[in-house]
């Protein structure tokens, strides 16, 4: 399969691309490469394009001949989005429908979109499932949900659309991120021997980056009829930030101090990943 991955030089992409190459796929990575290209080693079946997903002329040149698009590129969380909301909207929302439309016009067969579990907002239900109402708390999350609806409107028997709602990813990658909750706590515990927890009761569903990669591989291998127009949560555990801090302390060392402070960040997510298990047989392992 020939696959275009937007944002393929990012955190998840830097782990996903080598796995796809190992399986024999031909990969094109379209990325601004603002963190450099070295996270992706050269390969005979890998083409790296430094470019912007907002450039529609570029998309029209790049997309022909691809079987699938895996859309990872975005301003990737609330704090980053809020630094420049206009830029965030232009990348996360305004560029989305043109990418989908041009993909379909160029006979791309599958389009997989990386959304976010944050689209649910705060829910009282113990297990939040894919059919529940979206109540996003931020523009970042709202635009993620809006893009899901746009993608679904383009689905057909010849254009298979699938949305993944990842939990907060954690773990090591060549293009490492230290702004994700488990990675933040681990970094501070190791280097400072101290963890500052803001709030602490908020639930954060997490998923290891290896499992995140495997979920995309599983979707790509699944029969189109099973996944067309489907939305899947992907997560491992729904733990509070306090519980995560204790887990990190147990791994890093008993001398690590946990300091709790107040927070106005009331984002709290708790998701069920049963649907992806039932439909395509995917379960987290790490």
Q: What feature does the model see in each segment?
A:
Residues 78, 113-126, 139-145, 169-173:
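Conserved catalytic-site region of short-chain dehydrogenase/reductase
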Residues 53-91:
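NAD(P)H-binding glycine-rich loop region in Rossmannoid oxidoreductase-like domains
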Residues 44-55:
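Rossmann-fold cofactor-recognition segment
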Residues 149-204, 209-217, 248-249:
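NAD(P)-dependent short-chain dehydrogenase/reductase
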Residues 54, 83-98, 134, 138, ...:
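Glycine-rich NAD(P)-binding loop of the Rossmann-fold in SDR/ketoreductase-type enzymes
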Residues 71, 97-137:
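Conserved Rossmann-fold NAD(P)-dependent oxidoreductase catalytic core, especially the SDR/UDP-sugar
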Residues 192-193, 198-286:
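C-terminal substrate-binding subdomain of Rossmann-fold SDR/epimerase-dehydratase oxidoreductases
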Residues 3-23:
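N-terminal Rossmann NAD(P)H-binding glycine-rich loop of SDR-like oxidoreductase domains
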């Amino acid at each position: 399969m020939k696959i275009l991955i937007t944002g393929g030089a990012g955190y998840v992409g830097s782990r996903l691309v080598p796995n796809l190459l190992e399986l024999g796929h031909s990969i094109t990575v379209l990325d601004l490469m603002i963190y450099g290209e070295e996270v992706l080693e050269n390969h005979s079946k890998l083409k790296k394009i430094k470019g912007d997903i907002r450039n529609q002329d570029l998309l029209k040149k790049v997309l022909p001949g691809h079987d699938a698009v895996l859309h990872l590129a975005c301003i990737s969380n609330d704090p980053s989005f809020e630094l420049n909301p206009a830029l965030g909207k232009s990348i996360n929302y305004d560029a989305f429908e043109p990418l989908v439309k041009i993909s379909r016009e160029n006979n791309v067969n599958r389009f997989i979109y990386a959304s976010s579990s944050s689209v649910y907002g705060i829910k009282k239900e113990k297990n939040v499932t894919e059919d529940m109402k979206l109540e996003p708390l931020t523009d970042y999350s709202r635009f993620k949900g809006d893009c899901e609806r746009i993608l679904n409107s383009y689905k057909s028997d010849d254009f298979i659309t699938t949305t993944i709602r990842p939990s907060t990813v954690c773990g090591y990658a060549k293009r490492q991120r230290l702004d994700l909750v488990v990675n933040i706590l681990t970094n501070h515990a190791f280097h400072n021997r101290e963890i500052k927890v803001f709030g602490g009761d908020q639930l954060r569903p997490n998923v290891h980056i290896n499992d995140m990669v495997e979920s995309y591989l599983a979707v790509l291998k699944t029969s189109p009829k099973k996944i067309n127009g489907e939305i899947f949560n992907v997560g491992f555990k729904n733990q509070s930030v306090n519980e995560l801090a204790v887990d990190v302390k147990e791994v890093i060392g008993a001398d690590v101090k946990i300091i709790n402070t107040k927070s106005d960040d009331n984002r709290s997510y708790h998701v069920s990943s049963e649907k992806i298990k039932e439909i395509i047989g995917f379960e987290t392992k790490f």
